[in-house]
């Protein structure tokens, strides 16, 4: 592969480094761990968020509370480099820090900040919060990542290819056009799209972008020719880049249909997401499954459930039992993922909790300005407060995510059909003998086809209303509860652990990026 700079708004590397919000960051983190082991010439560019995404805490009544707590790190190297970018006709200084390879076992990553004394108050706030709801700050963040990141890479590295993971760093391509022309840019940029719906692809008023410096010194007429007006980031990236990739086979089919009208667009290839088994998988579970040692697997799973249930008790005052089937719904809290679905028929759920001895845990972070989803989170808090065997946890970050995946028995995934480009949380759960139960969307389409006996599929993949999906889940859970903790269950778990890493480990993904995108 060509030496490549990988630009991404977020990286989930390790619990102490709060530079991520969700799946995009989890994917980038796993990619960089695998690429390091494979000795791939990959370097990352991201932003050092002063306050991270946000800290998810509880108020006095136990409801979710958003807090912004400044983060400090002593493991990032100050490389003594500041580069200027122009935002709103104002010079903003961007300072770079470097995460060296040996700190967390990744390829190197440069983290950028504007939160330094050389900048005015507004400029300092640009890198305060990941995915800031203020649109002006949001665009400014993209300029810092794209143009500031390019200038840092130009000073520090010798790369031959620029990869945009999502089109957030799109100002990068206009900087390349400005310096080298459109044809050079087309030969030296690639990008990854993660969005299966047209409305999920970012658009902005082209004159606003021009006034903010998004296009640098490139003529706005060329920008409009590439991205239209309103300016569509993904359309522009498809026209400017050498190649693009979707993040699952189904997502590629969706993208080819969705963007069939775009003239002169690049090829879209499929590279299905994956996760790093060496970070996410418990080594004892790996060993037990490999030997098909059911007693060893069961014993370790019970130990991991105890660890998870200590966290449950600490947060909620509820005592969960390790001999009960434990179902977890945990991921980014957003409407299309349907976190509410298990409570669609409350009486059916109560019956499962009582008669089938099932336990349920929710966790996940809504966007701090998504008041509807924060209300949904708090509705689940109130619904489960007096519900024995059901609860919801706060603080869904890498540490808790790993704890939930290792301590659960069923990993529940309920996206609306054709809304999930890939998803990855179920991969890492499956690596830890937590069996995936999902609607037929995203990566699950491939997993269910490869090994239909290693997961549970919700519904027929056609009907998708909440009542139908909820009823399918309740019926499945009734069957699964009867199977749980039998020899058949643990054999299924062993197969799941062994088979998932054949295709959904990050080393396969990193090799495919090298072969299909970075060639």
Swiss-Prot record:
SUPFAM superfamilies in alphabetical order:
UDP-Glycosyltransferase/glycogen phosphorylase
Q: Which GO terms describe its molecular function?
A: glycogen phosphorylase activity; pyridoxal phosphate binding
Identify the InterPro entries for this entry: Agluc_phsphrylas, Glyco_trans_35, Glycogen/Maltodextrin_Phosph
What Gene Ontology biological process does one annotation of this record name? carbohydrate metabolic process
Q: Which domain of life is it from?
A: Archaea
User: Family assignment?
Assistant: Belongs to the glycogen phosphorylase family.
Q: What is this protein called?
A: Uncharacterized protein MJ1631
Q: Which organism is it from?
A: Methanocaldococcus jannaschii (strain ATCC 43067 / DSM 2661 / JAL-1 / JCM 10045 / NBRC 100440) (Methanococcus jannaschii)
């Amino acid at each position: 592969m060509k030496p490549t700079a990988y630009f991404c708004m977020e990286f989930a590397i390790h619990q102490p480094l709060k530079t991520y919000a969700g799946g995009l960051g989890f994917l980038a983190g796993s990619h960089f761990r695998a690429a390091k082991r494979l000795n791939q010439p990959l370097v990352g560019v991201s932003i050092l968020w002063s306050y991270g995404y946000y800290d998810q805490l509880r108020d006095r009544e136990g409801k979710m509370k958003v807090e912004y707590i400044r983060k400090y790190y002593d493991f990032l190297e100050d490389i003594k480099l500041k580069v200027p970018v122009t935002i709103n006709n104002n010079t903003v200084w961007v300072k770079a820090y470097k995460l060296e390879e040996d700190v967390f076992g990744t390829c190197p990553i440069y983290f950028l900040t504007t939160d330094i004394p050389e900048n005015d108050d507004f400029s300092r706030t640009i890198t305060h919060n990941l995915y800031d709801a203020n649109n002006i700050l949001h665009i400014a963040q993209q300029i810092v990542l794209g143009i500031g990141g390019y200038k840092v890479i130009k000073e520090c590295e010798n790369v031959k290819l620029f990869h945009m993971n999502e089109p957030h760093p799109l100002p990068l391509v206009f900087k390349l056009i400005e310096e080298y022309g459109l044809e050079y840019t087309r030969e030296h940029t690639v990008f990854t799209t993660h969005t299966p719906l047209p409305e999920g692809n970012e658009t902005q008023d082209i004159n606003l972008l021009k006034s903010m410096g998004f296009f640098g010194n490139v003529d706005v007429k060329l920008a409009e020719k590439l991205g239209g007006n309103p300016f569509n980031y993904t359309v522009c990236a498809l026209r400017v880049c050498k190649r693009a990739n979707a993040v699952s086979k189904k997502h590629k089919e969706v993208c080819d249909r969705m963007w069939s009208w775009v003239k002169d667009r690049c090829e879209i290839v499929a590279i299905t997401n994956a996760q790093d088994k060496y970070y996410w998988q418990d080594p004892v579970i790996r060993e037990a499954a490999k030997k098909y040692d059911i007693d060893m697997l069961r014993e370790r799973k019970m130990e991991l459930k105890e660890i998870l249930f200590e966290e449950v008790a600490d947060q909620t005052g509820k005592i969960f039992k390790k001999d009960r089937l434990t179902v977890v719904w945990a991921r980014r809290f957003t409407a299309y993922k349907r976190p509410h679905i298990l409570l669609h028929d409350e009486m059916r759920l109560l019956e499962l909790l009582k008669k089938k001895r099932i336990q349920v845990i929710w966790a996940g972070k809504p966007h701090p300005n998504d008041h509807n989803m924060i209300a949904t989170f708090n509705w689940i808090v109130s619904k489960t407060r007096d519900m024995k065997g059901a609860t919801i946890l706060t603080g869904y970050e890498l540490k808790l995510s790993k704890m939930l995946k290792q301590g659960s028995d069923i990993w529940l995934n309920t996206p609306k059909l054709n809304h999930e480009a890939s998803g990855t949380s179920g991969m890492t759960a499956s690596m830890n003998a937590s069996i995936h139960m999902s609607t037929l969307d995203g990566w699950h389409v491939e997993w269910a086809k490869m090994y239909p006996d290693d997961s549970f599929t919700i519904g027929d993949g056609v009907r998708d209303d909440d009542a139908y999906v909820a009823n399918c889940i309740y019926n499945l859970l009734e069957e699964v509860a009867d199977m749980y903790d039998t020899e058949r269950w643990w054999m299924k778990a062993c197969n799941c652990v062994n088979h998932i890493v054949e295709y959904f480990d990050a080393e396969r993904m990193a090799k495919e990026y090298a072969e299909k995108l970075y060639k």
